[in-house]
C-alpha cells in the first residue's frame, strides 16, 4: 500500500495553520468559518435545497478535507435543519472528501480550537479520526444521520476509485483546496472530469476561486458555471450546476453491483456477528428487517466464542487483503466503541502481538512490513520490546498491532440483537431454519420457507455461515468449511500477567477478569465438520504454544485438562476474502459467459444475478475485524448509498469473482 504522509504545517501570527508542502493557509485568517458558509453552503443553496429534497440521503463531495472546517460547518447546519424540519424526507447527510496529506490528530485538535462554536462536532470527529492509512475511511456519526467518507491519498488516484452508478453520486460539490497557483497538480481538467462523472444530474458546485481556467474546465466537463460575488473583499468566485450528465458507471459488467429495487422488507438469514452488524446498519437507515435464525438465540455458531482477537489481516503492498482489512479494522474499532456506549460486552484494546517464532513466520511478517503501513497500525518489536509488551518472558521479535485487542463475540452479537429488538423496525425469529427461497417474478417477492411456514420479503440476505449450501441459490459458491476448537484454561498468577493477545501458530488471549479464564486456539479441521469435543484438538492447542515458544516455563501453566472448550465451523474462501454483494445465478452465468474470454470489455453484458438477493459469507477467522465495515458495504449497496471501499477492491469481494476469473481464462466452472 502507498504510504500516507501527514501534513507538515506551521502556524502564522493569526494562529492559522499553514501548509509547508503548499505554502498556503488552510483557511482565511479572518472569518474563515463565515467564508466557508458563504462560499460552499450558500452558493450550493443549502439548506434551501434540503427542504425540497425528496430522498433519504444528501451527498456532498469535497476535493480537500484539510482541517475539516467545511465538514463541521455543514454538519452544524444539517443538525439545525433536522431540528427545524423533523418531517422532511431528507434524514441523512453523507460527506465524501479527499486528502493527500492528512493532519495529525494533534494538529487537527489545535486547528479546531479556532472555532469554539463547532467544538461539540469537532470532538466527535476527533474521537474517530483515522490513522494515516490509504484509501477510504468511513466515520458514522449521530447514529447514522451524518456519514463521513474520508479518502486518504492523491485525489487523482482516489477519485476514480469511488464507486458510482449511472445515476451518479454527488448532489453538491465543494471544490476546495489550496490556491490553484499553489497546487497546480490538483487543479486540472482531469479533476473536473472526475467531478462530473461522480455528479448527479442537477448537482451544484461552488469554489472560492474565480480563475478562468477553472470555470472553463468545469464547463467543458459538463457543468454550467458562472461568476458570482465573492466573500468579503474578494470580488468574484464561481458557482454552477451539472447541465447534462452522461450516464456511466465504473463497475465492470461482470462485477456489477446493484441496489435492491424494493426495500419494503428485508430478511436476513443467519444469527452471527455478520447478521447482527448488517441488521444494525440497515435499521439505522430506517429499513424494516426480519432475522431468521435456526438456533434458540444469536451467536450459537462461529460467533459464539468467549474471546476473539481483533486485528487486521495484512500482507504485502497493494493486495486486496490489505486494502480490505486495514480500513475494516479501523472501522471495527469505531463500531465496537460506539456499541460499548449502549450495550455491555467484555472487550479490551490491549494490543495484539504476532511472534516471529520460526524462519517461515519471520519471512512472512518481514514481507508484510514492506507494505509501508502506518506505525499506528503495526510496528516491529525487538525481543526485549516483545517481552515488555506482552508482560511475560520471551526471546523472539514480533510485530505489534497497538490498536488491536480482544472482545467477546457472543456478548456483542447478542447485545446488538437485543438492542435491535427494542425498535419497531426489527424482528427476530429464532428456531426458524430457512429451507428454501423462491422468487415470485410477477409479485417481485421472495418466499422463505421455514418450519413449514412461508414468509414473504422484498429483499433477502443470506448470512448463514457454513449453512450456505442448504439453499439452492448459494450452494454453488466456492467456499469451504473448517472446524475449529478453542480451549479455555484457568488463570494462574503468572498467566494473568499477559498484557497482549499473543499470536504464533495459534493464539492466546489475556485472562478475562470477569471469568478468570483465557482462550487458546484454534484448531483447523476440514475432515470432521461436527460440534463434538475433540481431545486431539484440545491437546494440540497447547502443544502449538509450547512448540512455538520453547524454553519458557509459563507455557506449561496453560492447563486445558478440564476439557473446557467450544467448537465452531468457519466458512472460508480460497483467497481469504469474504463474499459480499449480489448472488449470481450460477447456471445462467455458465451459459451467459461461456465465451467471456473472447469478448471485449465494452461488449460484455452485466452479469446475471438473482433479483434482490444478496450474500454476506466467508468471513473465516476474521469476522470481528471485517464484519462491521462489510456490513456497511452491503447495507450501502442494498440501499443505493455511497460505498466505502475502492471500486477495484469491491471486485475482490464480489460473490461471483472466482467464477468470472475462470471464465475469463476460458476455463469451465462446472467443478467449482
From Swiss-Prot:
It holds the Pfam family DAO. Its EC number is 2.1.1.61, 1.5.-.-. The lineage of its organism: Bacteria, Pseudomonadati, Pseudomonadota, Gammaproteobacteria, Vibrionales. This is tRNA 5-methylaminomethyl-2-thiouridine biosynthesis bifunctional protein MnmC. SUPFAM superfamilies: FAD/NAD(P)-binding domain. InterPro entries: FAD-dep_OxRdtase, FAD/NAD-bd_sf, MnmC-like_methylTransf, SAM-dependent_MTases_sf, tRNA_MAMT_biosynth_bifunc_MnmC, tRNA_MNMC2, tRNA_S-uridine_synth_MnmC_C. It comes from Vibrio parahaemolyticus serotype O3:K6 (strain RIMD 2210633). PANTHER family: SARCOSINE DEHYDROGENASE-RELATED (PTHR13847), TRNA 5-METHYLAMINOMETHYL-2-THIOURIDINE BIOSYNTHESIS BIFUNCTIONAL PROTEIN MNMC (PTHR13847:SF283). It catalyses: 5-aminomethyl-2-thiouridine(34) in tRNA + S-adenosyl-L-methionine = 5-methylaminomethyl-2-thiouridine(34) in tRNA + S-adenosyl-L-homocysteine + H(+). One of its GO terms (molecular function) is flavin adenine dinucleotide binding. Residues 1-243 are annotated as: tRNA (mnm(5)s(2)U34)-methyltransferase. GO terms for cellular component: cytoplasm. NCBIfam families: MnmC_Cterm (TIGR03197), PRK01747.1-2 (NF002481), PRK01747.1-5 (NF002484), tRNA_MNMC2 (NF033855). The keyword Oxidoreductase applies. Residues 269-672 are annotated as: FAD-dependent cmnm(5)s(2)U34 oxidoreductase.
Amino acid at each position: 500500500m502507498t504510504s500516507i504522509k501527514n501534513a507538515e504545517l506551521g502556524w502564522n501570527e493569526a494562529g492559522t495553520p499553514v501548509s509547508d508542502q503548499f505554502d498556503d493557509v488552510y483557511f482565511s485568517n479572518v472569518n474563515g468559518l463565515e467564508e466557508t458558509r458563504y462560499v460552499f453552503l450558500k452558493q450550493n443553496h443549502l439548506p434551501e435545497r434540503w427542504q425540497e429534497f425528496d430522498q433519504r440521503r444528501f451527498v456532498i463531495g469535497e476535493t480537500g478535507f484539510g482541517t475539516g472546517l467545511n465538514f463541521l460547518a455543514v454538519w452544524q447546519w444539517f443538525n439545525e435543519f433536522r431540528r427545524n424540519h423533523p418531517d422532511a424526507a431528507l434524514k441523512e447527510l453523507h460527506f465524501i472528501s479527499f486528502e493527500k496529506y492528512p493532519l495529525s490528530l494533534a494538529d487537527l485538535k489545535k486547528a479546531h480550537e479556532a472555532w469554539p462554536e463547532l467544538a461539540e462536532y469537532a470532538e466527535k470527529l476527533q474521537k474517530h479520526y483515522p490513522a494515516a492509512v490509504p484509501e477510504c475511511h468511513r466515520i458514522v456519526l449521530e447514529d447514522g444521520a451524518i456519514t463521513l467518507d474520508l479518502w486518504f491519498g492523491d485525489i487523482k488516484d482516489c477519485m476514480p476509485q469511488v464507486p458510482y452508478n449511472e445515476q451518479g453520486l454527488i448532489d453538491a460539490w465543494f471544490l476546495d483546496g489550496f490556491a490553484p497557483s499553489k497546487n497546480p497538480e490538483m487543479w486540472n481538467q482531469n479533476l473536473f472530469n472526475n467531478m462530473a462523472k461522480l455528479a448527479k444530474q442537477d448537482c451544484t458546485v461552488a469554489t472560492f476561486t474565480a480563475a478562468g481556467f477553472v470555470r472553463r474546465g468545469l464547463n467543458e466537463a459538463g457543468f454550467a458555471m458562472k461568476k458570482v460575488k465573492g466573500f468579503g473583499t474578494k470580488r468574484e468566485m464561481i458557482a454552477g450546476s451539472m447541465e447534462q450528465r452522461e450516464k456511466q458507471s465504473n463497475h465492470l459488467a461482470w462485477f456489477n453491483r446493484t441496489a435492491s429495487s424494493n426495500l419494503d422488507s428485508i430478511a436476513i438469514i443467519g444469527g452471527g456477528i455478520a447478521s447482527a452488524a448488517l441488521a444494525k446498519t440497515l435499521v439505522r437507515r430506517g429499513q424494516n428487517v426480519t432475522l431468521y435464525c435456526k438456533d434458540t438465540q444469536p451467536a450459537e455458531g462461529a460467533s459464539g466464542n468467549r474471546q476473539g482477537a481483533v486485528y487486521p489481516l495484512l500482507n504485502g503492498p497493494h493486495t486486496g487483503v490489505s486494502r480490505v482489512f486495514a480500513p475494516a479494522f479501523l472501522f471495527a474499532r469505531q463500531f465496537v466503541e460506539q456499541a460499548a456506549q449502549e450495550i455491555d460486552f467484555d472487550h479490551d484494546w490491549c494490543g495484539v502481538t504476532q511472534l516471529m517464532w520460526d524462519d517461515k513466520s519471520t519471512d512472512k511478517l518481514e514481507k508484510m512490513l514492506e507494505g509501508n503501513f502506518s506505525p499506528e497500525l503495526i510496528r516491529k518489536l525487538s525481543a526485549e520490546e516483545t517481552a515488555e509488551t506482552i508482560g511475560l518472558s520471551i526471546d523472539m521479535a514480533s510485530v505489534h498491532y497497538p490498536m488491536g485487542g480482544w472482545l467477546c463475540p457472543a456478548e456483542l452479537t447478542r447485545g446488538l440483537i437485543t438492542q435491535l429488538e427494542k425498535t419497531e423496525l426489527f424482528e427476530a425469529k429464532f428456531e426458524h431454519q430457512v429451507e428454501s427461497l423462491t422468487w415470485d417474478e410477477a409479485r417481485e417477492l421472495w418466499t422463505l420457507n421455514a418450519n413449514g411456514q412461508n414468509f414473504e420479503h422484498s429483499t433477502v440476505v443470506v448470512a448463514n455461515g457454513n449453512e450456505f449450501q442448504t439453499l439452492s441459490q448459494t450452494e454453488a459458491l466456492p467456499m469451504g468449511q473448517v472446524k475449529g476448537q478453542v480451549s479455555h484454561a484457568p488463570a494462574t498468577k503468572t498467566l494473568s500477567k499477559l498484557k497482549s493477545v499473543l499470536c504464533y501458530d495459534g493464539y492466546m488471549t489475556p485472562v478475562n477478569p470477569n471469568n478468570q479464564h483465557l482462550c487458546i486456539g484454534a484448531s483447523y479441521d476440514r475432515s470432521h465438520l461436527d460440534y463434538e469435543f475433540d481431545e486431539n484438538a484440545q491437546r494440540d492447542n497447547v502443544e502449538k504454544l509450547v512448540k512455538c515458544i520453547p524454553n519458557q516455563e509459563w507455557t506449561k501453566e496453560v492447563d486445558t485438562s478440564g476439557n473446557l472448550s467450544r467448537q465452531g465451523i468457519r466458512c472460508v474462501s480460497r483467497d481469504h476474502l469474504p463474499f459480499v454483494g449480489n448472488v449470481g445465478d450460477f447456471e445462467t452465468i455458465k451459459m451467459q459467459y461461456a465465451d467471456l474470454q473472447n469478448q471485449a470489455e465494452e461488449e460484455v453484458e452485466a452479469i446475471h444475478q438473482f433479483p434482490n438477493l444478496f450474500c454476506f459469507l466467508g468471513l473465516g477467522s476474521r469476522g470481528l475485524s471485517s464484519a462491521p465495515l462489510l456490513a456497511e458495504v452491503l447495507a450501502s449497496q442494498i440501499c443505493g448509498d455511497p460505498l466505502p471501499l475502492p471500486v477495484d477492491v469491491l471486485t475482490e469481494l464480489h460473490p461471483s469473482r472466482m467464477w468470472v476469473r475462470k471464465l475469463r481464462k476460458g476455463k469451465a466452472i462446472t467443478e467449482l
